[in-house]
Amino acid sequence: MMSTYFSAPLSLPTASVPAFIALAGPEESAREGLSGEAQLGLDKVFEADGALSGQAQMLLAPIRKDSTPLTQFAVSPRYASSGVRRQCSFIAPGQSTILSSLKEPETTQVYLAETHDVPQIVAEFSTFPSLKNRFDGPKRVPIEFIDAANSGDALTAHDILLEELQKSKKRSSFTRLVREKNWEYAVWTSWMRSPQGYHVHRSYTVLSVPWAAYLVSARTLPESYLTQPSNAPNLAHASGPAGDLEKCTRTELWAKLAPFVVP
């Protein structure tokens, strides 16, 4: 049984989360670069004298230690509210920091978790286990679908995907499940921190229905809690033409993701 919370989570405006992560930098420069708006969103992490609160210091410690965080993004018409979920894991020995927005996109919960629980937290982020491996989906999806999904527009992405699938006369469980809005588009991204900021190391994009999962060849990434320099490549290790799908069993997928969650 997981013992996730060490203390009550810190609730922050999602827009202020990148600024909170930046506070893990050198103390003398951590607050200098924050805009007035970001500082307003982070008022609860500072004491009256301007020092970081004890809770903030505990949450920032794993962020400071982990130079290869993992971000997760998922969009599905099945999700409540905006249809979008976001999560970021900074994995360190003993305790890790999780930043998570699963229900209300404008708010992010930041909490400490036992590091040995992180693989389960990462796995439970996605609601589609894809146990049956019944592969009868298309060979590719429109780039417009990828763009809509990456922007968090679940309804537009759904319409584009369904329209494309309905062009085929072939019956498939994949098309039926998509028609029922039983699909999920998820992106797992491993980052590397450098003095210039965070850079994408490796990313996997997956389109899944309850019966099957497919790796998506994508050239773009959704917005996340981490940003990389504007002159850096947008995505590393993409394979095949954009939009191509590759069958992927649950075992194969977790073999690819396992290195992301090993501290």
Residue locations for each model-derived region?
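Short, surface-exposed polybasic-aromatic patches that bind anionic ligands, especially phosphate groups
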Residues: 1-263
